A protein has these predicted regions:
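Short, aromatic- and cysteine-enriched interfacial helices/patches
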Residues: 66, 158-162, 186
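Low-complexity, repetitive regions of proteins mediating host interaction that are extracellular
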Residues: 23, 131, 141, 148-152, ...
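Short hydrophobic membrane-inserting alpha-helices and related fusion/pore-forming segments
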Residues: 147-172
Length: 267
């Protein structure tokens, strides 16, 4: 068998994300129509395993095996993340802003219409709710890459666009070698995640009754052993993007239907 070094390759095609790819083993992930997370592992182009994590019970992983059976002699089984480590999950908010709502500022726009220009803007405020930390101690894990991905996803209930690059960084940072899709050297580590949830309120400066709530999240993930520790990941709308053209476009598209417009300034 050929040993392959872990890769940090992370790409997306349509709604399926490639989480891990070492040239022989490929792990992909996506969210199905019911909100479940689904992870698949391919070996030399052939599907060998599919794991499903229910949005209602993320600590249980349903596994299906293709072309062979697992070490338990079954084509299907379930595992619990607590079989592989110790989970300490806090649902208490560590911190909220001193004021119940933070004013980020106002984005001022100008659109071209038949009669000339129209000026308008968005007043943008947000709440920040910090939850955690959640910690998961992995005890001597040996097994497939897709199971490791699923275990971490289930432990932290973080979205696939976040768990993908983190697991790739963890595998690379720990210097793990994968042989035919299997991590054979026992992996032990403690991973910690602090989640910050943002709820934005966008209010039309020309009509206060025209408003909308949108969300985003920040995940600070670290561990005790990896060279890739202390990573921050963002999803959705976060203050990290405030002042960027991208955020001005995102928020405008959430609220307005003008096709020819520009940002005048931020205030």
């Amino acid at each position: 068998m050929t040993a392959h070094a872990a890769s940090t390759n992370y790409s997306s095609e349509e709604n399926v994300l490639t989480i891990y790819d070492d040239g022989e083993t490929v792990v992909k992930g996506y969210e199905d129509s019911t909100g479940n997370m689904v992870f698949t592992q391919y070996l030399r182009g052939n599907l060998v395993q599919r794991n499903t994590i229910s949005s209602n019970n993320p600590e249980i992983i349903r596994r299906e095996f293709f072309g062979n059976t697992n070490t338990r002699g079954a084509s299907k089984d379930t595992i619990n993340i607590n079989e592989y480590g110790v989970l300490n999950k806090s649902t208490a908010a560590l911190h909220q802003s001193v004021s119940p709502r933070t004013l980020a500022g106002t984005i001022n726009y100008r659109a071209i219409i038949d009669t000339g220009y129209v000026y308008y803007g968005l007043r943008c405020t947000y709440d920040a709710n910090v939850i955690g930390p959640t910690t998961y101690t992995i005890n001597g894990y040996v097994g497939t890459v897709v199971d490791l991905v699923s275990i971490i996803a289930g432990a932290f209930t973080i979205p696939i666009p976040i768990v993908g690059p983190y697991v790739a960084a963890l595998i690379s940072g720990l210097g793990i070698t994968v042989v035919s899709g299997v991590i054979e050297s026992a992996l032990s580590d403690t991973v910690s995640c602090i989640e910050t949830d943002y709820t934005w309120t966008l209010t039309d400066t020309t009509d206060s009754y025209h408003s909308k709530n949108v969300t985003g999240a920040k995940y600070y993930i670290t561990d005790t052993k990896s060279a890739a520790k202390d990573k921050t990941y963002y999803e959705g709308y976060t203050p990290n993007d405030w002042g960027t053209q991208a955020m001005a476009v995102w928020f405008h598209n959430e609220m307005f239907g003008y096709t020819a417009w520009e940002v005048v300034n931020w205030s």
